[in-house]
UniProtKB/Swiss-Prot annotation:
Outcome reported for the amino acid change (mutating H1122Y): In strain: MD-8
Applications reported: Patulin was originally used as an antibiotic and specifically trialed to be used against the common cold, but it is no longer used for that purpose since it has been shown to induce immunological, neurological and gastrointestinal effects. Genotoxic effects of patulin with dose-dependent increase in DNA strand breaks in brain, liver and kidneys have been detected in mice. However, more recently, it has been proposed that patulin might also have anti-tumor properties.
Keywords assigned by UniProt, alphabetized: ATP-binding, Cell membrane, Membrane, Nucleotide-binding, Repeat, Transmembrane, Transmembrane helix, Transport, Vacuole
Phenotype of null mutants: Strongly reduces the production of patulin and leads to the production of a distinct dark-red pigment.
GO CC term, one of those recorded: vacuolar membrane
Pathway: Mycotoxin biosynthesis; patulin biosynthesis
Domain ABC transporter: 98-341, 767-1013
The protein's name: ABC transporter patM
Free-text function comment from the UniProt entry: ABC transporter; part of the gene cluster that mediates the biosynthesis of patulin, an acetate-derived tetraketide mycotoxin produced by several fungal species that shows antimicrobial properties against several bacteria. May be involved in the secretion of E-ascladiol to be converted to patulin by the secreted patulin synthase patE.
Length: 1394
């Protein structure tokens, strides 16, 4: 039950109009609508809304009104700044050291909204209009109380008579802001998504059956009834269509039943009919629930506008109109503006927010109309409408002051926190089980690792020679979970926007999501038993239930504690690049201070305390105690000193193992681990408790960190510009909301088109005329239900100088057709004929086709000019000089009015160009190639009406210059569709229903449909009419077979004959002259792509800084731990394992490399590969080449801070060898990381695979599992383990010729036979021994040092100094193999047939 406030404000209602509706603009996954998906027969929208509200609320709620008076919003920053580079980052770092410079740092701010006032009465809908960047989103966020994103909010804002801040504190669930982006868990179904939101907002008292009823009813309201059991999906996971995904977002928002609903561009991705249908439903929703709704809508038709009560028009952050919708047009006409008969009221109002030259003044009033935002604001302030609005504000304030309604505090969340955690955990279980790719990789890797390690250490005997093997096996048992936990650290970054959204919706607290993940982990980590069982029993650990389950509990808690720790680090990091640095350093520290490499007694005083922060240390001590405490170990035949013939009396021998007593053949396990590692048997359960406590602590930290998540205000809406000598930027005009430079864009693209004509008069179009024709095009895919046809015998053509619109209802296959024509179809079986100028279309011609995708896919660090220049250099013929190509790019920039952003980085949404600018860049990239044929997939999607019109006029002018263009569109205004020559209209199932001329005001196409259906109304949008009559919309009842009508019509038959004449018979088809698949030679491709990739690295200093600082941190950790290792047995051990620890940094290095490789790969796969921009080999080579300098630099930094402090040899030949090998190791780590990234489907799986392969290589490096004691079945693996050659080379290099002098604690003591000296007694033994006697003249106590020098020490690992130089070549071969496999896997998985 929802409590509400009271308001006596009147409701101004707009008559509800019904219109034909449609589903989304592109829905390859949609099938025909079923009866269950639609509103029940005979049930009106009003009845459906009423039924849901009664289910959800138990009745009609009371009223709530909004009053805002002189509200202003101030944002942080200037809105634009120079792009950071490695150089600028270094300068900034040095600048921070200057106290004076720090004091001079200034906090910049910028106004976004200025002095807005108005009221929204209960049951009213407010339409917010404005050009992108004018402040529409900021206004909605301000109404919604999302003030954290801004530096300051000023003015008075009340809801139900109460200050908004009080409402946010007392009843935040009554306010909702639905963003334009669609953030969902992609592997959940639509029903699961809506059920979670509905359950969370209804509370625990509502039964599951009632929840299901609500979900069904809500899905019907937004037309999702037929896809309830379909995955939501995203850009990578196939699910519902984009329009349906948008409706899922809207349904989720409505499920909250908020009192104030703010929707940011809710019709984005919806076709015109579906958009009207949604607004009709919202009109009923607000009227019946008496809630308040405010929406920004781009490309709003008159039908959509008619549902609103009031409209707010914003121009550059200033309020230029607020009042009734019905009075808005007359108001601006009174100011002197003219609304043409062909212009919709929505476009006329929207253009008031645009630039001066776009607006049309009445004759003889050109100099009297307002031009700037300030002039508009002054004109509105002087108008009667403004005075009436101010009066209504004051009246509302007085009414609330005299008759205030109570503000009853209720819980913001309908579900108690424990219920939220429970439902979040259940949802996470569903996500884990439905997204099998990641957990399948994880499970496979741990099972394989377990089998490898178990068989490698199998059936160890209880002898002293197995002590180190047991310790190594136990170390691996705690290391593998650590690697797995580290690989999972980045899993939550993609969900951050979703978590913030659900917090905003009061669906669930972020801490509930975090603890739900913890609950899932507690159960899912039990799957680690798949790892534990083989390793434990194959190795030969104590086979008792008590020991096994104790061991399992220890590993289990360690895994949980580490997972929570790395997740906490990631949560408190702003992004993945920043998180990699602490994760890599902490991982290295945890492994180093586990207690094996550096036992506690040998830890340096200044760093030994780190072990107390280390879950691995507690786990390793516990598993060692669990295994060793109750056992004794027989002294092995090789361990007694002296040994051999004549040495059979143990009374005069000692087992040369730490912890042994002279004359005793048995070694107590407890004594050994205490003497060697400093472990105490009493610590077993203490450590279990500590790790359990660390798990709880880090879990709470992750929850607290998740609860603290918010969008940082200082990083919003910033445009970065290229910074270089001679480059100046025009930043005189900044978008009030996004902070983006507008320059004189609109003055250069005016509605009068005079400037447009001048700009394009030099555009000659393609060099030749072309006619692309297709006949009998069919596309069939296999589904669970059988074969499904997406395209059904389609025929058509597009000619030079022709602008053809491709439209269709839901599931028509518009994008599928474009992909098929452009040679980009990747699914199903495509049949039919494609011909160019009467000849079979060759593959190489694809590089001459331009394809503007619906998604704007660009490298964020490229400038607009660089993006266009790259395309021109790679896709235009080599015969054209680079200078001419660049000159043509400048013309394209001018044609698209992008001069002011030519040197701006494309960036990402929210930190880069806005949607309109990004769309222009996408078009410009394709125009820069001077294509013969241009395809565009919904280029106006998400743009406001005026921006869409500018794009349409641009296409019109391109067509007039001779360009052949086929363009899909949705939500087209009547004026916009009038720019097109032809219409290619599809119905569901990929059937053609019309292919012909549109005519003036679409007269010809209307004449075809009207005799066969209803007439088109005089004010009706022709585009909406076409979709309506052929059956668009979730409630449309049209059942006519329009495809058959077209095929049987005279126009259809004539068109078919004309198109068949353009396509030759297969046996007679002439071939175009064969040309190279790519426009320029490979070396040119490689050079251009390398330049682009270099700038990608150079302009993201976070990556380089992270790489260098990780090298600094890990090298200092290693060197300070082993600082100036002495020439003792322990010192030799330290030297070996210090070298080995330098290899443990491999997995963290992979965490840095892989995301960048995947980013470059995705851009290549989704855009550049399809257009044959460059060969796939150029992508792989460039990614590897550009990594090398940064890899070499970071390896150099690591080596300098590690090698000399440890105390290794200073001789150039020795130091140089280690330096070379470590540089090669950096290259190897990079190549292995890129190999895993090329092999795996996503970055999370790549992280897991990288850890697995490094684990495998480290296992056979020869230090933890020495080759001489390895079972023969595994010994050959050392020959294929790259780290064995590296470990051998570096180890022998740092130990050869090193004299070893044992300390007192390292000496083995035995007693000489009476009458002999120690030297005499042991002389036969010493002839073959690796050590020496310290006191050969003694006749009693003999002191034996096990190792004489470094070479005698490293022989135990099977290393040989003679292999030193050979290993360089072998290691280089492994690097070459890795890189070759990167090429092979990229070719097999990402290139298809190219």
């Amino acid at each position: 039950m929802v409590d509400n406030y009271h308001s006596s404000l009147d409701v101004a209602k707009t008559p509800i109009q019904s219109d034909a509706d449609a589903q989304k603009s592109e829905a390859e996954t949609e099938g025909p609508s079923s009866k269950s998906s639609q509103i029940a027969a005979g049930e009106s929208i009003a009845d459906s809304v009423r039924n849901f509200l009664e289910l959800r609320q138990g009745g009609i709620p009371d009223d709530t009104g909004v009053v805002f008076d002189k509200i202003s919003a101030v944002g942080s920053g200037t809105g634009s700044q120079d792009a950071p580079t490695v150089t600028s980052a270094a300068q900034s770092a040095f600048g921070l050291l200057s106290p004076l410079q720090n004091r001079q740092r200034k906090q910049y701010s910028r106004p976004i909204l200025s002095g807005f006032s108005g009221t929204i009465n209960p049951g009213e809908m407010l339409l917010v209009l404005g050009k992108p960047g004018s402040g529409c989103t900021t206004f909605l966020k301000t109404l919604s109380g999302l003030w954290d994103e801004y530096k300051e909010i000023q003015g008075e804002l009340t809801l139900g008579g109460h200050p908004l801040l009080d409402v946010m504190k007392q009843r935040p669930q009554d306010i909702l802001f639905c963003a334009e982006s669609d953030d969902h868990f992609p592997t959940l179904t639509v029903a699961e998504t809506l059920r979670f939101a509905t359950r969370a907002r209804c509370g625990p008292q509502v039964s599951a059956r009632e929840i299901d009823t609500m979900v069904t009813q809500l899905a019907k309201l937004v037309g999702l009834g037929n896809v309830l059991n379909t995955k939501v999906g995203d850009a990578k996971i196939r699910g519902v269509s984009g329009g349906e995904r948008r409706r899922v977002s809207l349904a989720e928002a409505l499920a909250t039943c908020a009192r104030l609903i703010c929707l940011d561009n809710p019709t984005h991705g919806l076709d015109s009919s579906t958009a009207v249908e949604f607004m009709e439903m919202m009109r009923e929703w607000t009227t019946q629930s008496r809630c308040v709704a405010a929406m920004s809508v781009y490309q709003a038709s008159d039908a959509i506008v008619s549902y609103f009560d009031k409209v707010l028009i914003i121009n550059s952050g200033r309020q230029i109109y607020y009042g009734p919708v019905r009075d808005a047009k007359a108001y601006f006409e009174d100011l002197g503006f003219e609304c043409l008969s062909t212009t919709t009221v929505a476009d006329f109002l929207n253009v008031m927010s645009a630039d001066p030259d776009v607006r049309r003044a009445q004759e003889n009033r050109e100099n009297q109309v307002p031009r700037t935002a300030e002039e508009f604001e002054r004109a509105f302030s002087a108008s009667p409408i403004y005075q009436e609005m101010q009066k209504s504000v004051q009246v509302a304030k007085e009414r609330f002051q005299t008759n205030p309604s109570p503000l009853v505090k209720t819980s913001a969340f309908a579900l108690p926190i424990w219920h939220q955690i429970w439902y979040c955990a259940g949802r996470q279980f569903r996500i884990v089980t439905s997204d099998y790719s990641l957990w399948a990789v994880e499970l496979a890797t741990i099972v394989v690792q377990s089998l490898v390690l178990g068989t490698l250490f199998r059936n160890q005997q209880r002898t002293t020679s197995s002590l180190f093997i047991f310790a190594s096996a136990l170390f691996y048992s705690v290391l593998v979970p650590a690697l797995q936990s580290m690989a999972e650290f980045g899993n939550g970054f993609a969900q951050r926007p979703l978590i913030l959204k659900q917090k905003r919706y009061q669906i669930s607290r972020p801490i509930a999501y975090a603890l739900g993940l913890v609950t899932t982990d507690v159960v899912w980590k039990v799957a680690a038993i798949c790892y534990n069982i083989p390793l434990y029993f194959l190795t030969g650990f104590q086979r008792t239930a008590g020991n096994f389950f104790t061991w399992f509990l220890i590993i289990y808690l360690e895994h949980l504690a580490l997972s929570m720790f790395f997740r906490s680090v990631a949560i408190f990091s702003p992004n993945m690049h920043r998180a990699v640095l602490p994760v890599g350093i902490f991982f290295n520290m945890y492994v180093l201070y586990t207690g094996l490499y550096v036992p506690a007694p040998q830890m340096q005083v200044w760093l030994g305390w780190l072990r107390y922060l280390n879950p691995l240390y507690y786990a390793f001590e516990s598993v060692m105690v669990n295994e060793f405490r109750d056992l004794s170990y027989q002294c092995s035949a090789s361990d007694p000193v002296p040994s051999g013939l004549g040495y059979n009396d143990m009374a005069h021998q000692v087992c040369a193992v730490v912890g042994s007593e002279p004359g005793d053949r048995l070694l107590s396990g407890a004594s050994y681990i205490h003497a060697q590692y400093g472990f105490k048997t009493s610590h077993l359960w203490r450590n279990v408790g500590i790790n359990a406590a660390l798990f709880v602590f880090f879990a709470l930290c992750s929850g607290i960190g998740m609860e603290m998540l918010k969008t940082p205000a200082g990083q919003l809406a910033t445009v970065f510009y290229k910074s270089s000598p001679g480059v100046t930027h025009r930043r005189d005009k900044i978008d009030s909301e996004t902070g983006q430079d507008q320059g004189n864009e609109s003055s250069e693209m005016s509605a009068g088109q005079s400037n447009d004509a001048l700009r394009l008069q030099e555009h000659q179009g393609p060099d030749k005329s072309h006619n692309l024709a297709w006949t009998n095009l069919c596309l069939d895919i296999k589904t669970k239900e059988g074969d499904q046809r997406l395209l059904n015998n389609l025929s058509g053509s597009v000619k030079s100088g022709q602008l053809k619109a491709l439209m269709g209802v839901s599931g028509a296959g518009k994008t599928t057709l474009l992909n098929a024509l452009a040679g980009r179809s990747t699914i199903g079986n495509l049949t039919g004929t494609l011909a160019l100028n009467g000849q079979v279309l060759p593959t190489f011609f694809r590089s001459r086709m331009g394809y503007v995708q619906q998604q704007d896919i660009h490298l964020p660090t490229q400038t607009v000019r660089e993006a266009l220049q790259m395309t021109a250099r790679l896709r235009r013929p080599e015969s054209i000089s680079v200078a001419d190509k660049n000159a043509y790019v400048e013309k394209v920039i001018e044609w698209l009015s992008m001069e002011h952003i030519a040197d701006a980085l494309v960036g990402v949404p929210g930190a880069g160009l806005n949607l309109e600018q990004r769309k222009k860049v996408s078009i410009g990239v394709e125009m820069a190639s001077k294509p013969e044929i241009l395809f565009l997939d919904e280029p106006t999607s998400g743009l406001d009406g005026q921006s869409a019109m500018l794009i349409a006029r641009l296409l019109r002018r391109l067509a007039d210059s001779g360009q052949a263009i086929l363009c899909t569109i949705h939500q087209p205004a009547a004026e916009l569709i009038d720019q097109f020559d032809k219409l290619y209209l599809l119905s569901r199932g990929g059937n053609l229903v019309y292919d012909g001329s549109l005519g003036t005001r679409c007269h010809e196409a209307i004449q075809y449909f009207q005799p066969r259906s209803r007439p088109c109304g005089p004010e009706e949008n022709p585009a909406e009419y076409f979709l309506a009559v052929i059956g668009a919309g979730s409630r449309n009842d049209a059942h006519m077979d329009w495809a058959s009508l077209w095929n049987d019509s005279e126009q259809g038959k004539e068109r078919e004959k004309a198109e068949e004449s353009l396509v030759p018979a297969a046996e007679q088809a002439p071939q175009l002259e064969q040309q190279s698949l790519y426009s320029v030679p490979f070396h040119v491709q490689l050079w251009v792509v390398v330049q682009r990739t270099w700038l990608y690295y150079w302009r993201e200093p976070d990556y380089v800084n992270s790489k260098l600082w990780m090298s600094v941190g890990n090298s200092l950790l290693n060197s300070l731990t082993h600082l100036q290792s002495p020439n003792t047995e322990r010192g030799a051990y330290n030297r070996v394992f210090s070298a080995f620890m330098s290899l443990i940094v491999g997995p963290p290095l992979g965490l840095q490399v892989q995301p960048r490789f995947v980013t470059l790969r995705d851009i290549f796969v989704h855009r550049e590969r399809e257009s044959l921009t460059y060969h796939w080999l150029a992508f792989v080579l460039s990614a590897f080449i550009v990594e090398l300098p940064f890899t070499f630099l970071s390896s150099l930094v690591y080596w300098l801070l590690w090698y000399f402090p440890v105390g290794y040899f200073n001789a150039p030949s020795r130091a140089g060898y280690s330096f070379l090998m470590y540089e090669l190791f950096g290259v190897f780590a990079t190549s292995l990381a890129q190999l895993c990234a090329s092999l795996m489907p996503n970055i999370e799986a790549a992280f897991a695979a990288n850890g697995f392969f490094f684990m495998f290589c480290n296992t056979f490096a020869g230090t933890l599992s020495p080759k001489p004691v390895t079972p023969s079945g595994w010994r050959w693996f050392y020959n294929i383990s790259p780290l064995f050659y590296l470990g051998e080379g570096v180890t022998v290099d740092v130990l050869q010729d090193l004299p070893i002098r044992c300390e007192e604690s390292e000496v083995s003591i035995f007693y000489a036979v009476n009458g002999t000296t120690c030297g005499q007694y042991a002389q036969d033994f010493l002839k073959t021994a690796t050590g020496y006697l310290l006191n050969p003249a003694s006749t009693t106590e003999c002191q034996y040092c096990r190792y004489r020098d470094g070479q005698s020490y490293f022989q135990q690992y099977g290393y040989e100094f003679a292999h030193r130089h050979r290993n360089i070549g072998v290691f280089i071969c492994f690097i070459a193999f890795n890189f070759t496999m990167v090429l092979v896997m990229t070719y097999l998985t990402k290139t298809r047939r190219h």
